[in-house]
């Protein structure tokens, strides 16, 4: 680091210390007595300047859950100059979403996500009170993820799932890295459904390269950033993360803009595909949507959707291989139901649906929901005050293993979703189960995921018997987790597909 930057950093740290001391004085005294307002949540004692950052080393959702066992299900942390409130139980989550959903519906935007103006045009990061967010949410609900829209391209999805099965058939008897093959197949499913383009062949080097680009971009976005801890340092971009994100986003947007440009050229000659991209470009021509919003929306679907569904499938397969009884039960249900699986069959396979739900409960792809931000005073959770401007973190991984809500919470028991008297679905209305979030910020891609993940899993279980490589037993299978923004297997799953007659 150059001498000038060291001086700037030293000055920034001095200013940070003043902020920190001012905060201590404000909470110690302040304009009203302690008895007149709820207390802040308990939490580990913060260090000057850095707060509790050193307490968060390791797998983040595991570490937060461990701290919550000491300090309680509503816990306060200090992250640089930011106050964070961590919610780790069903009851606390229910109170937050039922009483304060609107007040907590804003986002904490990481500085790297401001690259290319992404956060100002993204449904992920725009405040829910922003008219642009409401308009984009309506477009997604009407044109991308509506039952009618998804039904219109069902045959495309079924064709791409057959391609996935065909790839594994070509590798029958061989050791295959499951996640890489599934990612390629799901990538094609998403790209073909939304803009009628095969991004890559299943298992191809091109798909691997695209995934590396997305993962590199996600890593840059997820990396701890001093600009987020001390916002007045943003302009300096001391770690270069915004510059790195700018470069990766430019490459990703370039790929998508090329697809859009080719489609626009074809449309001038009357060539239409009738897919989601055509629907979005119709809105652009009608003045109801900006062209750059089309690129952003495709980027969100392409980047987040492909990875989320493929990781969910890898976890489901890993848990079935670890639990041979559950594997036999799932395959028996399929053998009794259909010789060839179609997408509509998956909804009529209750045990398969339970397997998917249980895998997502134990290993949510997003174990920590994207941070919310309190936009008003008066938010209270579990008897504790959430200050205006505070970051609110929902540890979905801990909530979905809350022993007050689940029996044997750390075990893979799909039957729990069949035995309950109240149906538990993916929509976050039962606050012990939040794989896609809840409230205003419920994941908009849920309607696609709840069709694709069970359908792909059913197709693979019907077509093959699945084995682990020689020398690996079910008991030895490593299902430890690694997390940056997605919760993936620390050791990629390797499988051997065996064709079923």
Curated annotation (Swiss-Prot):
It catalyses: ent-sandaracopimaradien-3beta-ol + reduced [NADPH--hemoprotein reductase] + O2 = oryzalexin E + oxidized [NADPH--hemoprotein reductase] + H2O + H(+). This is Cytochrome P450 76M5. Signal peptide: none annotated. It is a single-pass membrane protein. GO terms for molecular function: 3alpha-hydroxy-ent-sandaracopimardiene 9-beta-monooxygenase activity; heme binding; iron ion binding; monooxygenase activity; oxidoreductase activity, acting on paired donors, with incorporation or reduction of molecular oxygen, NAD(P)H as one donor, and incorporation of one atom of oxygen. Enzyme of the diterpenoid metabolism involved in the biosynthesis of the oryzalexin class of phytoalexins. Hydroxylates ent-sandaracopimaradien. The keyword Transmembrane helix applies. One of its GO terms (biological process) is diterpene phytoalexin biosynthetic process.
